[in-house]
Amino acid sequence: MSEINISAAAVKELREKTGAGMMDCKKALIETSGNFEKASDFLRKKGLAAAAKKAGRIASEGLTAAKVDGLTGVVIEVNSETDFVARNEQFQDLVKDIANFAVIAKTIDTLKTFKMQSGKSVEEEIIENIATIGENLTLRRMDILEISEGAIGSYVHNEVVPNLGKISVLVGLASNAKDKAKLEALAKQIAVHVAGNNPQSIDDSSLDQALIERERKVFFEKSKEEGKPDNIIAKMVEGRIRKFFSEVVLLQQNFLFEPKLTVAEVIKNAEKELGAEIKIAKFIRYELGEGIEHEEKNFADEVAAITQG
């Protein structure tokens, strides 16, 4: 078949409609002689064959999602290769559906085999979406938060649609306080705080000891270089460790909404107001793509290369 002339505008329009890759869109338009609807169908039919090839590509964009159902909450991360796909409604619907099932599934292995409304498993549904969207997609991780009594607060930062965004946080407050609305409001505020301040643990006893020792060593060596006496160094190191705790331990951080108070002090005040003990049972904070290698691409160059090639 001789290649017909396909405009960049047509390729862009098909990509916006289907979410498929630029090269796949151009190929589909060529194969269907520029017929837009047939090209869309072509992508749906042919995509599955290409899904395996796409599975090896780096997927560091996408969305995180938070879902709360009563006293159970989950956070998931589903990755795509580009931010463009994260704005695609089909991909957003997929992430929403997976989050809804995650609350029931409890573990990621169970979630992958969970049957969706289509009758396909979550894993099969992801593969089919790799086909139609044209990028590697991965259900990277999930975590669950369950409490027997209290409230769960959720917050999603940089939302693209409700409950889907770049950072998703859950905070579980264990309490028998009667005023659930106030307890939920506090949990929500702490969730916003966690999103912005990225604590590493709830208290200093649960902080990674290896991390503490690493920081202690850095502080010690820095003080040594300053030529301080050993007895002064010991005091300086402990002072810097306390400051380190105030930066990374949730209960010791200055509260985002009342900076003059620590999170622990805010909780104490809430306990007095609500007449009940309040304990942070757990928090989960997922930031999109953390720990994944990113691959930079120039969208304009990609369009030019594909439409000219």
Curated annotation (Swiss-Prot):
Signal peptide: none
Stored Pfam families: EF_TS (PF00889)
GO CC term (a single one): cytoplasm
Its biological purpose: Associates with the EF-Tu.GDP complex and induces the exchange of GDP to GTP. It remains bound to the aminoacyl-tRNA.EF-Tu.GTP complex up to the GTP hydrolysis stage on the ribosome.
Gene Ontology molecular function: translation elongation factor activity
Gene that this polypeptide is encoded by: tsf
Superkingdom of origin organism: Bacteria
InterPro entries, sorted: EF-Ts_dimer_sf, Transl_elong_EFTs/EF1B, Transl_elong_EFTs/EF1B_dimer, Transl_elong_Ts_CS, UBA-like_sf
Region (Involved in Mg(2+) ion dislocation from EF-Tu): 82-85
Similarity field: Belongs to the EF-Ts family.
Protein source organism: Rickettsia peacockii (strain Rustic)
Localization: Cytoplasm
Main location: cytoplasm
Record-given protein name: Elongation factor Ts
Keyword field: Cytoplasm, Elongation factor, Protein biosynthesis
